[in-house]
């Protein structure tokens, strides 16, 4: 996939120029999906990259959003300030995105995420801490919800069925962050428009941080196979990343086992700080 991208760039200097703009911009503008509240993702038909759209100017972003809207794709734009860029780029890794289509004026280039911002393998840098990420699941959910919510009462197509199967396969292999209150009893619950109650869980620390801005909750890590054991009685299932892709999944409840192992807490701030330090260090070496 990386070789294919390099072949499209006849001038070897160009990717560096575009990557430099990504690093040094005071602000950038991202196209957001109206279906997921996250960056709009698409699969490039030529390179098969899973990419997002970034613009260096607001007018260009508005024009790009208008083109998508004309295709009945609900989108908006979001300004990303310089101080938030590193965390924004780090979040692309957790989303499963591997490339950015960068628009500078009338020019555009597909830039691989690893060409301008790199990080070490979390498995090599967690220092005994529990590191939670589910990029394949997160990406598949984004594609699924972008399509499913595109039109009201849309029928389930064969393509959506395939994505559902992929989501199920990825989900059962993962481990997730479950929020518990710092003080007192009770587990946070989310009430959907249907009136059904779901327990929020998160694919990664960045999604948990969005939910826990007031720091009322502490995170614990639970494997997918054990989620049914910790599901509150009143909850119909779980909802993944409620402030983002917001995907509910019904979970078949099982009798809680008192001998179940204690869930280990994960340090959210430490993991985000570590990810940012690694990104800064790698960018400084280039």
Regions of interest found by a model, annotated:
Residues 1-286:
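An interfacial alpha-helical scaffold signature
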């Amino acid at each position: 996939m990386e070789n294919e991208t390099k072949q499209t760039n006849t001038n070897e200097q160009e990717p560096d120029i575009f990557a430099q703009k990504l690093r040094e911009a005071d602000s950038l503008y991202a196209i957001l999906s109206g279906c997921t509240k996250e960056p709009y993702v698409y699969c490039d038909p030529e390179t098969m990259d899973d990419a997002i759209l970034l613009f260096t100017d607001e007018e260009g972003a508005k024009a790009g959003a208008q083109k998508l809207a004309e295709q009945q794709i609900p989108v908006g734009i979001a300004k990303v300030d310089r101080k938030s860029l590193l965390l924004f780029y780090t979040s692309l890794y957790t989303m499963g995105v591997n490339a950015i289509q960068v628009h500078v004026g009338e020019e555009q280039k597909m830039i691989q995420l690893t060409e301008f911002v790199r990080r070490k393998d979390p498995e090599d840098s967690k220092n005994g801490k529990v590191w939670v990420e589910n990029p394949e699941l997160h990406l598949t959910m984004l594609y699924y919800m972008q399509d499913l919510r595109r039109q009201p009462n849309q029928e389930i197509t064969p393509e959506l069925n395939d994505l559902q199967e992929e989501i199920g396969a990825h989900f059962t292999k993962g481990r997730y962050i479950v929020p518990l209150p710092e003080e007192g009893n009770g587990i946070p619950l989310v009430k959907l428009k249907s009136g059904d109650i779901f327990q929020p869980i998160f694919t990664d620390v960045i999604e948990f941080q969005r939910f826990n801005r007031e720091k009322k909750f502490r995170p614990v890590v639970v494997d997918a196979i054990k989620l049914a054991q910790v599901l509150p009685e009143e909850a119909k299932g779980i909802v993944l990343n409620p402030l983002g892709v917001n995907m509910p999944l019904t979970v078949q409840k099982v009798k809680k086992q008192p001998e179940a192992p204690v869930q280990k807490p994960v340090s959210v701030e430490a993991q985000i700080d570590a990810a940012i330090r690694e990104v800064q260090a790698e960018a400084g070496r280039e």
